[in-house]
Amino acid sequence: MAVVKKKRNVVVGRVHICATYNNVIVTIADQQGHVLVTTSAGACNFKGSKKSTPYAAQETVARAVKAVIERNGMKTVSVCISGPGAGREAAIRAVQACNLNVTSIKDVTKLPHNGCKLPKRRRV
């Protein structure tokens, strides 16, 4: 279930989507960065390996956006997406399908400049 903070009228906001290999986390905030709604695929009753699917990302974003439109009356958003997960494109498409004006889509995935050593590869 989406966690909704206060009820106040916010027309313009930001949607932060973190799509990892294991989960999808969606946070919707106003322009100042105050969080209005946050939810994840696990909170939307997707368990185990189903949390990282594109369908889970789509449903998670749809629930969060629906909650913020009902509660805060949001109309325009900019999307910031991070992480290498499978649900990236599905999450962006879900935001665009929810009757919100998307002003910008920004990829804020952090890339190392040869930083820490990666985990060893799985041998199956």
From Swiss-Prot:
Subunit note: Part of the 30S ribosomal subunit. Interacts with proteins S7 and S18. Binds to IF-3.
Family: Belongs to the universal ribosomal protein uS11 family.
Protein name, as recorded: Small ribosomal subunit protein uS11
GO cellular component labels: ribonucleoprotein complex; ribosome
Taxonomy, superkingdom: Bacteria
Record has Coiled coil as a keyword: no
Keywords: Ribonucleoprotein, Ribosomal protein, RNA-binding, rRNA-binding
GO annotation (BP), single: translation
